[in-house]
C-alpha cells in the first residue's frame, strides 16, 4: 500500500471514529435527560399513588383527596373524541387511497390534512371555542372538549388509513374485483382486514396524543372541581388539574399533580408500546 493510500485510509478511520464518538455522545446526552425526567417523575409521583388517588375527587387546598373526577373526565372526552373522529378519519383516508388517489382534490386534501396534523392544539381549541362554545352561550362542556380533541384525532387517523391502504398489494384488489365483488365490498372485506393492524395502530397513537392535551381543553371543557357525568356540563380532566395543581403553593396539590403525571405517563407509554407491537407483528407485505 502506497504512502498516499495509507494516509487516506488513516484519515477515513479517524473521521469514522470521530463520527461514531459524536453519535454516541449525542445518544447518551438524550438518554441522560430522559432517565432524569423519568426518575424525577417516579420519585415525586410514586408517594401519592394509592387507592385514594383513584377513588376520591380533587380536594380543597391543604386537604387530602384524589383525582377520580379528573380521570373520569379525561376518559369521557378521549372516548368521545375517538368515537367521533375514528369513523370520519377512516372514511376520509379510504377516499384518499381508493377513490381520489389520482385526482388533484386528493392532493389538496392531503396538504390540508398535513397542516391540521401539525397545527398547535391551542389553535384548535380556540377554533372550537369560536365555532361551538360561543354559539351555545359560552357554555363549556365535556362535549366541546371532545370536539376540540376530534380535530387532533382526525388527521392522525386519516394519514394512517391512507398510508396503510396504499401499502396493501394491488394484486389483492385485482383478485377481489376479478371475482365480481363490488369495490365497496372489496374495501370492507379485503382491504380493511389487511390494513386493520395499521389502522388500529393509528387510532391508539391518536389516543395517546390526546390523553395529555391541555391547551384545547382550557377553552372548551374548562374544568370542574366536582364529579360530573353530564357531557354537556363543564368537566374535570387530568391535564387541566395537573396544570392547576402543579403551579399552586400547596404541597398536597403538588403531590397530586406529580402522581397524575406519573399515571398519565405510564398510560401513554403502554398505549404507544401496544400500538408499535401490534404494527410490528402485522406488517403488510409490499410485494
Swiss-Prot record:
GO terms for biological process: phosphate ion transmembrane transport. The keyword Membrane applies. It comes from Xylella fastidiosa (strain 9a5c). One of its GO terms (molecular function) is phosphate transmembrane transporter activity. Residues 71-275 form the ABC transmembrane type-1 domain. Part of a binding-protein-dependent transport system for phosphate; probably responsible for the translocation of the substrate across the membrane. It is found in: Cell inner membrane. Pfam families: BPD_transp_1. Keywords: Cell inner membrane, Cell membrane, Membrane, Phosphate transport, Transmembrane, Transmembrane helix, Transport. This is Phosphate transport system permease protein PstA. Gene3D superfamilies: MetI-like. The keyword Transmembrane applies. It comes from the Bacteria. CDD domains: TM_PBP2 (cd06261). The chain crosses the membrane at residues 22-42, 70-90, 115-135, 138-158, 187-207, 255-275.
